[in-house]
Amino acid sequence: MSQPITRENFDEWMIPVYAPAPFIPVRGEGSRLWDQQGKEYIDFAGGIAVNALGHAHPELREALNEQASKFWHTGNGYTNEPVLRLAKKLIDATFADRVFFCNSGAEANEAALKLARKFAHDRYGSHKSGIMAFKNAFHGRTLFTVSAGGQPAYSQDFAPLPPDIRHAAYNDINSASALIDDATCAVIVEPIQGEGGVVPASNAFLQGLRELCDRHNALLIFDEVQTGVGRTGELYAYMHYGVTPDLLTTAKALGGDFPVGALLTTEECASVMTVGTHGTTYGGNPLASAVAGKVLELINTPEMLNGVKQRHDWFVERLNTINHRYGLFSEVRGLGLLIGCVLNADYAGQAKQISQEAAKAGVMVLIAGGNVVRFAPALNVSEEEVTTGLDRFAAACEHFVSRGSS
């Protein structure tokens, strides 16, 4: 008989790059989770915007089990039917002509940055290697992507970092204009900065970046790892803004619960890549592709996408009511079901404490830095689950305020 597993085992056995909650979830269904002791939680964290259809969705389980009964993996020396069907679905639903599959958002962004540099190298010469990104951005944890992310706390201990990366102020087109030049090969931007505080870009900002990229022959990369696959109420956020990138990265919700990532791009951009210029062993494996194909089928419908917008209203209305009662937040912002509650000055830096109180009350929420409580629930979360979860969140806020902010 195997030994019991406890939260303390994490501290004994794991490399300490995470500080997980004191409880261990063991079962999930829809937007509910249960821990080892049987306590129920309403899940508004969604696996950090991953569980777009909730936990253990029956049609995703069926797709996974059906493919698992056939074969799981062959490597990139062979293709497979599920990945080709998935590629066609993404192409038909977006601006893209070509797709590269991988296993995560970081890998997708790594592929995008490499493609952008190769495109510039082949078309204009090796001098055109600059990348413009934005302060407080997050693009992944590889050395290249963490350098593109504009958060020094994540990169400063890993020098020397890849060169020729500049960081402009987000939502400030004048700052971007001052840094871009003809040696810039790409601009990478999140339509909503997720880890940076749930900060939506303005339409004028993204349109301005499109114009700057066109003027300087640079590729525009939208990192839609967090905003993609219905999260904003559109299949991808670029559709909400009406600004089309040259490359788009997607992951998280694309797999529902299953690890998968993808780079979407045009025929022109893809043409610089040839056999061997990039690759991955597991990317586009049949298991991930079968699940992701079903995810797209279920999410890319008017009913689901319009439902996201309706659920946004449920959350914002209730969160504003909670805030009116307890006065914690200076702003509730975001699009669709990516929502951030910004702490006011009296409670600055204490988002983590509020999330911990929420877990005690039986609701899981995220943070986005020290000052923002973040919500990224399943896109099909029910009205009853929203009501119950936010009642628990209100109780957590009451307890947090009553015990003092220290």
From Swiss-Prot:
Enzyme class: transferase
Reactions performed catalytically: N(2)-succinyl-L-ornithine + 2-oxoglutarate = N-succinyl-L-glutamate 5-semialdehyde + L-glutamate
Cofactor list: pyridoxal 5'-phosphate
Keywords: Aminotransferase, Arginine metabolism, Pyridoxal phosphate, Transferase
One of the record's GO molecular function terms: identical protein binding
GO BP term, example: alpha-amino acid biosynthetic process
Pathway: Amino-acid degradation; L-arginine degradation via AST pathway; L-glutamate and succinate from L-arginine: step 3/5
Origin superkingdom: Bacteria
Keyword Cell membrane recorded: no
UniProt KW Zinc-finger keyword: no
Pfam families in the record: Aminotran_3
Entry EC number(s): 2.6.1.81
CDD domains xrefs: OAT_like
N6-(pyridoxal phosphate)lysine modification, residue list: K252
Stated family: Belongs to the class-III pyridoxal-phosphate-dependent aminotransferase family. AstC subfamily.
UniProt xrefs under PANTHER family: AMINOTRANSFERASE CLASS III, SUCCINYLORNITHINE TRANSAMINASE
Protein task: Catalyzes the transamination of N(2)-succinylornithine and alpha-ketoglutarate into N(2)-succinylglutamate semialdehyde and glutamate. Can also act as an acetylornithine aminotransferase.
Protein name per its UniProtKB record: Succinylornithine transaminase
Organism: Shigella boydii serotype 18 (strain CDC 3083-94 / BS512)
